[in-house]
From Swiss-Prot:
Binding residue positions for substrate: 66-68, 102-103
Xref: InterPro entries: Mo_CF_biosynth-C_arc, MoaC, MoaC_sf, MoCo_biosynth_MoaA/MoaC, Mopterin_CF_biosynth-C_dom
Keyword Lyase recorded: yes
Name of the protein: Probable cyclic pyranopterin monophosphate synthase
GO MF term set: cyclic pyranopterin monophosphate synthase activity; GTP 3',8'-cyclase activity
Coiled coil: none
Organism: Sulfurisphaera tokodaii (strain DSM 16993 / JCM 10545 / NBRC 100140 / 7) (Sulfolobus tokodaii)
Length: 151
């Protein structure tokens, strides 16, 4: 068994790294309407979830022990309101020696968790359970490594 350690990337080249991750949260139609109409008691769900996702991307190496601290150059969290829920798409870019998919995964995951937290009051049934609410399909939809003149 090997010891836990951060992988040595010192000999790798600095290149442009990009990762795009999406995830989905299924919500009740009534909750979606509250989000659209900005009637959620905790505030603007879209703005808060985007902000949480961006912050999460920046905090990834503090949350996931073996992640390298990467100087992120771009983080975008897009949230699309769909018929049965919200889709979160996070894009992260950096010129570095290792990929940024963990940062994009973290951004999407935390944005989805933030949405759940902000609307949980409206999602509970009469027993305080969440029979309809579901976070699903968190996946890397694109990972790009672009070689340019950065070294």
């Amino acid at each position: 068994m090997t010891e836990a350690k951060i992988v040595d990337i010192s000999s790798k080249d600095i290149v442009l790294r990009e990762a795009v991750v999406e995830g989905y949260i299924k919500l009740r139609k009534e909750t979606i309407e509250k989000i659209k109409n900005k009637e959620v008691e905790k505030g603007d769900v879209i703005t808060v979830a985007k902000t949480a996702g961006i912050l999460a991307a920046k905090k990834t190496p503090e949350l996931i022990p073996m992640c390298h601290p990467i100087p992120l150059e771009f983080v975008d969290v897009e949230i699309k309101i769909e018929e049965e829920g919200l889709r979160v798409i996070s894009t992260v870019k950096a010129h570095y020696k290792t990929g940024v998919e963990m940062e994009a995964l973290t951004a999407t995951s935390v944005a989805l968790l933030t949405i759940w937290d902000m609307v949980k009051k409206y999602e509970k049934d009469e027993n305080g359970q969440y029979p309809y609410t579901e976070i699903k399909s968190i996946r890397v939809i694109n990972k790009i490594k672009t070689y340019d003149d950065m070294k």
